[in-house]
Amino acid sequence: QVLTPMRKGLLGVERLNSILQEYLNPPEPGKAEKEYGDHKFRVGDKVMQIKNNYQLEWEITTKYGLTVDKGMGIFNGDMGIVTEINTYTETLEVEYDEKRKVKYPFELLEELELAYAITIHKSQGSEYPAVVIPLLSGPRQLFHRNLLYTAITRARKCVTIVGNDQTFQEMIRNTNEHNRNTSLAERIREFGKDPKACLAFYKGKALSQWTEPTAESLL
């Protein structure tokens, strides 16, 4: 999962999602897609619900289409995969965790956005097998140690930090928010001495070597 500090800019969520979508889920003959505002959704896209909607119905079905469970409510931060776009019924189907499927009327697509990249703030409370953190310069009030801490601790196995080493060092030093009693600062400071290194964690322990993740493992 790509986690970035900002929505706008060269490495912001909006630009990264556009680039990653074209690389990871490019258009193909026969692959359904739907444009809505500034977004373009395709079957196979990773998407995220961006507001609570207690009225959305979900259901879990067997491969034969029999409903085995159903309920109400999809919430801010829920992630899923676009599984169907039906221009006849004007609906887009997303499959969330536990095989919950939701059909969105096209007029509700404003509640979805691509989720190949999300902001670090939006990732709070979630975990991913592997995390990629792109860093360029940014406002000091945003680029601080706690933000870096939040991003790194979202990963269960591997963290890759790419970009500007000076920005990385400045974020370590910037305690703009309340200090945490943690050894993370020392750990990432040691990592920062080698700008060509890749920082990886497995079960909370820093690794000296790691296997480069596949594109699938980063999603």
Task: Give short role names for the model-derived ranges.
Residues 76-219:
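C-terminal accessory regions
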